[in-house]
């Protein structure tokens, strides 16, 4: 079993492990967000966009046996981690309390609640069939969209965000190959990414919006 096979399906995701995972992720992100010189770099991106959090959710989803278990554990992970991110930044003096409360109640609070139904759906990514492949592809599309937005920033200010670009696109390939074992299902996942991304770009074009 490779490292990635172990990570996506070979771990014992107990409740204590979920809580410790959430604490570790929250503290790390909070520290990265508190170091001002890191703001234009990939190390700070975990505090701004979702790429790492998608990966964390996939790790939990692929190591749960049932959908309800996945939903609850994903919810608890974000319930623990996100307030910690803001708490660390407030204590470090890089974020004022009222802004932290606003960001959490406006963004991550509602997003955390959505992980309950989201976790039920995300649990399907481990299924070795077309449905699992499609759900995985839709999740991977979030990584692709984030990666494309950072490509634009990378072109504008090289080499900032290079590691995040590599993480996004490399993560899609690694997770697809590690989670879906059959070639035909991997093809379905990659095809889903293409279709979903093209559809998103068409919607943005039709509404006069841009990706970045």
Task: Show which residues each predicted segment covers.
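Membrane-interface helix caps and helix-loop-helix hairpins in membrane proteins
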Residues: 38-40, 150-159, 208-210
